[in-house]
Amino acid sequence: KFKGYDIINMGNAVRAEAKNRNLEPTGPNLGKLMLELREKNGQGAIAELVVPQIKNSKLNVIVIDGIRSNAEIEVLRNYGTVKLLAIHASTSTRFGFLKQRGRLDDPQTKENFEERDNREIGIGISNSIALSDETISNNNLTKNELIEHTFKIIEGWMNEIS
């Protein structure tokens, strides 16, 4: 919960599934698992993993982080109004962020980063970005500026909807 909203992270759902399967949460393992889940359960499979969290939320507004495909958006539309915010940054900026973040599954080499990028492009992230209701360029923002900007947009949407 943050600023009065439930925050659900799709990547955390994949990490939880990896844990259930006793897989080490490395980038290659999580990438392979994500593709396997989509192949077996459809392109919206990762969104399906967060449905229980959506259903259990007592809040009217849920922020879902990490959408990668239009099929995931369609799954989420079964549970309410969906507004899409694309946060974009240059390749070098994103690589720097991921390297600094320091999660076990974050790419530490340019090669691993490019593999991750190509995997996400392959599942349709570019199409989801193209459908976004709003975009933020995150090349020169601090983390706090990004959060502030993001929640201003969300609050604007809330005023539109209500």
Outline where the language-model segments fall.
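A conserved segment at the C-terminal end of the G1
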Residues: 1-5
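Short, charged, surface-exposed secondary-structure boundary motifs
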Residues: 17-21, 93-99, 145-148
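A glycine- and Lys/Arg-enriched "phosphate-lid" helix/loop adjacent to the NTP-binding pocket
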Residues: 27-32, 75-127
